[in-house]
Each structure stands twice: as C-alpha cells, then as structure tokens.
Amino acid sequence: MAPFPDEVDVFTGPHWRMKQLVGLYCEKLSQTNFSNNNDFRSFLQSLCATFKEFKMHEQIENEYIIGLLQQRSCNVYNVHSDNKLSEMLSLFEKGLRSVKSENEQLNYAQQLKERLEAFTQDFLPHMKEEEEVFQPMLMQYFTYEELKDIKKQVIAQHSSQQRWDCAAEVLKGLSLWSQAEELHKAFKYADHEKTDDELEKELCSTHISQLPTEILLCLFRYLGPEDLCHCGQVCSAWSDLAKTGSLWRHLYPVRWARGDYYRGPPDDVNQEPDEEWVKSLQDEGKAYQEWDEDADVDESDASCEDSLAISAAQREKKLLNGMIQNLLPAVGSSVRSIVLAYSSTVSSKMVRQILSLCPNLTHLDLTQTDVTDSAFDSWSSLWACLSLEHLDLSGCEKLTDRTLKKLSLGLGDLASPTCSEKRSDRRAKLLKSPPSPISLLDKRSLRPTGHSRQVLIFKQWPGKLGSAPCSPTRVWVLDASELADIEDAAEWNRRRGVSTPEVRGFVETQPGGLSCCCRRRRGGFRTGFSTSYWQQQYGLGEAGCGHSTCCTGETALRTLGGLQYESYTTRGSAGAEFRTKCSSGGQLCLECDNRTDPSDGRRSLRFLSLSGCYQVTDLGLRALSQRGGLPLLEHLNLSGCLLITEVGLQELVSACPALNDEHFYYCDNINGPHADTASGCQNLQCGFRVCCRSGE
C-alpha cells in the first residue's frame, strides 16, 4: 500500500505501469531467439514501443510534477533527466536498420543485454527515489486539493497516449507535429501490452480517422465552407465535428455562391462597393426574377450572360435554403456575423428564420436587399437582439418605422430597471425628510407661469361614465426646482391626510407658457395650450411625447435614459433638471444624472445605416431614442431618408452621446443637428440609392 493517500499519490499508479513494462521486456529478453531474424526484429520493435512510453512518462513527470515542484522549492533542480532513454532508443533503431546477418544479430544481442541490464538497474531505483523523496516534498509544498488536480492531470496525460501514437505519422506528414506537441506534449500509452503483429502493423500504416478530435478541429479551421460541407459527408463523427460552432462564426452566403469563400471577420464597414459590381448583381436578380423555372417554353436560346446570372442566383438560393435547414439549427447560437448584402434571392421569410436561429448576432448586413418589416418579427420581444453592434440596412427601400420599433425593443431597455431602483431610493429618502411644499389650486385661479419658473401641472380626470358630477378641476403645481416623482407626491399626500386626486395625464409647461403635448396611457383630454407637432401632422393622439417635437429649441428635452450628456440644444445652459417618462413602463422617473455607462451589452449598437430607406420617418427615429437611447452608437447614416425632419433628427441625436460627427450622414436639405460638422448626404449622384437630388 502506498504510504500516502491514494487521491494525492501522483507516482505510484504510473510507476506500477512502468515496472510492469520492465518485467515484460526482461521476460522477452530471456525468451527471444536472436538467431531468428523475425524474433529479433519483433523484440526490437517491442522495445521501441516500450521505451517511447518510458520517455513520454518522464516528460509528463517533468512538466506536471517536477516542474511545479521546482517553482515552489529552490532545492529541487537538475534532478530529473531522461535516464539515457534517448540513447536506448537510438540503439534499438540502429539494430532494426543496420543489423542484417545472423552473426551481427548475435553480437548485437550481447550488447543489447548489457545495456538493458544497466538501464534496469538505474531506472528502478530512480522510480523508488521519486516515491520516497519527491512525494513527501509534494505533500509539503502543495495543498491537498492541488495534489488531487496534479494527479488528475498526470493520469489524463498518460491515458491520452495511445491515440497520439497512431496520429504521430499523419501529423508529421501534414507538417503539424510541432503544433500538436504544443497542444498535448504527450503521447498516449496502451492500457494492455500490444502483440508483435499489432506493433508492426501500427508502424506500417496510420489513418486520419485516428486523429484526436482536437487536431481534426484544428485542421478543419483551415478549410473553406465548401470543403467543410464535404468533410461533413464523410461519416457521422465528422458531420458532428464539421458543425462545430467556432467554425461558422462569420457567414457570407452571397460571396460563397459566387466562388469567394472568405470566412473571416467582416471587411471595412465604410468601404462602398464598386457600382459595376452592384449593377452586375442587380442584373443577376432581374434575370432570375424574369426567369420562370416552371415554364413550358424552351428557353435554351437565352443569352449566355442571362444563363450565368440565373445560375449564380440559383446557387445562392440553394445555399441559403441549405444553411437555414441544415446548418443554422446546429450552429446558430455561435454565429456572430451574417452578410447578405446585395442578395438577389433572399426573402423576408429567410431573414426572419435566420434571425430567429442566430440570437447572438453582432453584425448583420442586408444592404440593397428586398426585405420588408416582417423580416424582423423575431426582434419583437425585449432583448431579442441584445448583442447587435452593426446593422446595415442601406437600400432596403421597403422598410418602415415598424422595423425600427422592433429593433429598439430587441436591443433591450436601459431605463426600466434603473428607474425602479432610483424610485426605491427616493422613497426611502422622502420618508426621512420633510416633503417639499405642494399647493392645491383651483384651475380657474391658475395664473400663467413666468419665464423664471418651470412647473408640472397634474390635472384631475374630469369624471367617469356614470359617476357623479365633479367639482371644478383642481391641479397640482410643483416647483421644478424641487420636483419629484408622481408616486412620491401621492405618498406625501397620504402622510398629510390629503386625498389624492386620480391622476391620469400630465402636462409639461415650458418657460413662457409654451406647453408639451399631453401624454397618457389611454385617451384623455388635451390641454388648453398648443397641441404637439405630431398630433398636428398625423393626428396621433396616443403618440408618446418626444419632448423636442413640441418644445422650443432652447429648452428641448432629452430622452436619453442612461448617461449624463448635455443635449445638443441645451448645451451650455443651466436649466432645471427635467423629469421624463420611462418609455417602457409608462411610469414617471427622474432623468438619472449619475447612471453609469451600460457594461452588460444592452443597447450596444455602434453602427446603423438606413441609407435609402426613404419610408422611415421621425416616428422610427423616436423609437430608437427610447428605452435608454443608443449610448454607444458611433456611425449613423440617414442619407436618402426623405421624410425625416430636424425634429426627429434632434430627438435621436440627443440620445446618442457617442455619435461621431464624421460618421453622421443625413440629407443636405435638412437643417438638422451638427449641421456644421456632420458629413452630409452620401447618396448624391449614387445610381442605386434613393436621394432627393437624384434627378440633378
């Protein structure tokens, strides 16, 4: 029995195997007829395999035991050599290679016996020394758990040798042996002694199927998508391996269908394609759409160019269908980027299936495709595209504000949870401190507010169906400098014994008596002041207030729900702290001044291009500015968006504090934000994108 607990005894198990091998070659040494050439060569082959195992055993001990011990104790140095294993292997190989005649065999046998006896007398005491000297030192310098881990690693390395022996020759032929040594640094030994016939057969032939999974996967990384698909058809094991997620991080179906098998990260995002190349792809799509695959008429006389275009489009469609049906269900969660730019066959249904199968996308390019709003139905739930950083929808002319609303929802919500936490903190503080003064006034006695005061007016609901007639409407007038949440105000009234009116809507009043539009969950009454821009333009009584759409340029509010950045229009002014409405919950909250930059990946969009999406309006831009805005957005291209206005641009830009003016593009006819530093319209004289000046 070992003198140490078996769980932490790192030497006894492997040494038992080594001692067993010593006994086997000593027994064969006494039984081998060295006059017989077959027996002689069989014994030498057996010795080669045995001493390779000895050498690998020593290498494992050096790396996983002695090396670690030397790091803990400076008393251990230069104590573990290979015990002349390399010299013995050279002796065996020389015998197999050079000894031919019977006399040479007999002379060699005498030398071999002497060398083996000398090695045995040295090797057995060496193992005993490790068990009696090094094991106690390990117990002294390592914890019990550390020793358990060391033993597991040692056993695992010994157990992995057999398949490595078979794979060695294949790897050397592929010039990958050095890389394999770095990955494993150990061969696997046989659990049972191999027969001479097995050893001779093993030295003569190897097969790639014997490679470890890790090495096969390393080889597969050098293959293109077409070759990977071919490998997946070899056998079921390779089929599973070819569908490893790390092999399919970046997908380029359009390029692959045309023979370009690039599979690295996406190219330069600012590089526009050549117009001739775009035209050729458009011609392909046109030819494919005009071609009827079910036509009864012989179309064999079609031009060669049309035939090539149709063939390319057919390959693309077949490739897309194959990916959706066979590949993405297995690897979709690992896919990070999909580029479908200028695809002539992709449909909204295909895109919808792709997005539902690839929830962790960071890069999506649908430039100049024929998709509609329904393609993004899978983003209609909160946090559906949480990781998305790059979205290129340039030239997708059928997209409307509905897509942007889905995108805003899928990117997540920065405001909701934070606002809830802030309200809890405020309630605790309010219960400990005296409330701010609140005056209850009759509506008829309310005077217009002056330039020096900003107020919020909370109106009582005039009455419900079937209820008794109400007294004249009363309102709360709160000083903006001490303004708090509506829930806090209700709490104060409860503590003071004042009945709380049933609040259903609120009005924000700006300096000079200008008002904001009425915001409410259900239909209510508009205020007696001027109505909002959007209610005037589109009659949207239920539209949530975007503040800047109905406020003057000097006091436009921001809807940024995450970071402390000054609005473009309020930069340099010392206005009062405004309270805005959380876009998701419909409750009131303070505009948080000390909220930190989101680090959990929510609303992480950095690149957004809507170039040529002429159906997008300010409503879509406002949807993006809600739920915390786009705090990380750096690139925004709205070239060719003909229906957006200065108001909508300001709404979105105020929610994008990281926006780089050099990468901010919009129509030159709009007097929008950052007019002096933004880059203007990119679609001027562009032959394949919408532009208001395309007729010039």
Swiss-Prot record:
The keyword Zinc does not apply. Its cofactor is [2Fe-2S] cluster. GO terms for molecular function: iron ion binding; iron-sulfur cluster binding. Ubiquitinated upon iron and oxygen depletion, leading to its degradation by the proteasome. Ubiquitination is regulated by the hemerythrin-like region that acts as an oxygen and iron sensor. Pathway: Protein modification; protein ubiquitination. Its main location: cytoplasm. It is found in: Cytoplasm, Perinuclear region; Nucleus. [2Fe-2S] cluster binds at residues 667, 681, 691-692. GO terms for cellular component: nucleus; perinuclear region of cytoplasm; SCF ubiquitin ligase complex. Transmembrane segments: none annotated. LRR repeats lie at residues 343-367, 368-395, 396-421, 582-612, 613-640, 641-666. Fe(3+) 2 binds at residues 58, 61, 80, 126, 130. Residues 1-159 are annotated as: Hemerythrin-like. The keyword Cell inner membrane does not apply. Part of a SCF (SKP1-cullin-F-box) protein ligase complex. Component of some SCF (SKP1-cullin-F-box) protein ligase complex that plays a central role in iron homeostasis by promoting the ubiquitination and subsequent degradation of ireb2/irp2. Upon high iron and oxygen level, it specifically recognizes and binds ireb2/irp2, promoting its ubiquitination and degradation by the proteasome. This is F-box/LRR-repeat protein 5. It comes from Salmo salar (Atlantic salmon).
